[in-house]
């Protein structure tokens, strides 16, 4: 499936990665992170050779990730997780969030991601998108 969704075509930030690597040419990998709905950071590490694909197309991410409990388990009763085959959605870098990690022995970077559903729309269960909908309702009500 094509991961360059209609929502993300204008947000591709490959140039951000290229500029970062000019300044930090010894970077060996990227920690891809997002807070779940409990505020716990969840993520993956990708080799620097996979980073361009992350910035161009996004990264497959488990749809249940934002909804994990504080122990990292899928909450009983949710339809996301093993009950529905543990489907993937896409994680796309948040503009301007790519940064070096100076405290690690190997040169690494970190980037925040936001989640996009398979339909190309912002993933409704991600806290950032929940907040965005609430703010939009307040704006619509002139509050």
Across the structure, where does each feature detected by a protein language model lie?
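ATP/Mg2+-dependent ligation/transfer catalytic cores
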Residues: 1-143
């Amino acid at each position: 499936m094509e991961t360059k969704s209609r929502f993300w075509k204008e947000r591709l930030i490959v140039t951000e990665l290229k500029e970062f690597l000019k300044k930090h040419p010894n970077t060996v990998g990227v920690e891809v992170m997002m807070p779940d709905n409990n505020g716990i950071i969840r993520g993956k590490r990708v080799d620097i050779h996979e980073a361009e694909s992350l910035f161009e197309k996004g990264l497959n991410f488990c749809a249940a990730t934002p909804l994990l409990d504080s122990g990292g388990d899928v909450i009983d009763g949710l339809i996301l997780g093993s009950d529905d085959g543990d489907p993937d959605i896409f994680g796309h870098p948040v503009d301007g969030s790519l940064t070096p990690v100076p405290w690690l022995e190997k040169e690494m970077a970190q980037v925040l991601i936001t989640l996009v559903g398979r339909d190309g729309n912002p993933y409704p269960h991600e806290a950032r998108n929940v907040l965005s909908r609430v703010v939009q309702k307040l704006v619509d009500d002139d509050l």
